[in-house]
Amino acid sequence: MFQNSMTPLGYYDEFNCFSDTTFIIAAGAAGEIGYSRTAFWAADDCYYFDCSEMLLSRYLYYIFKSEQQYITSRVRKASIPRLSRETMEKMMISIPPISEQEHIISILDRFDTLCNDLSAGLPAEIEARQKQYEYYRDKLLSFKGAD
């Protein structure tokens, strides 16, 4: 169950949001953007977005993440910070064809994994540096044309 933070408040055997849903925290940690691969319960301080066949939820997540600064700037600062539903409803976004959305998602998911998943990102980085090392080592030690 998500309510006023990106940390689940708890776990519940029922849900009101299906898996692969983009959501935004509306109070407390207002403006924080999340994406859930599993079904969950969204409390009243959590806006979630039902996407149509024209808009993929993961694409919407990345759009919102790219607009994080704008969304955060729209949070009303008070004793409990709050983001209005109207702010989100008025946001204009570009919706390319599904195939392009899938391509964008694929690229951004891979980049996200490399940056945030140490078990995937670190080995890939180590492998890239190893290849770079071998390339420069071989170049330095080849002595071609040194006659």
Can you annotate each of these PLM segments?
Residues 1-147:
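Charged, alpha-helix-forming regions
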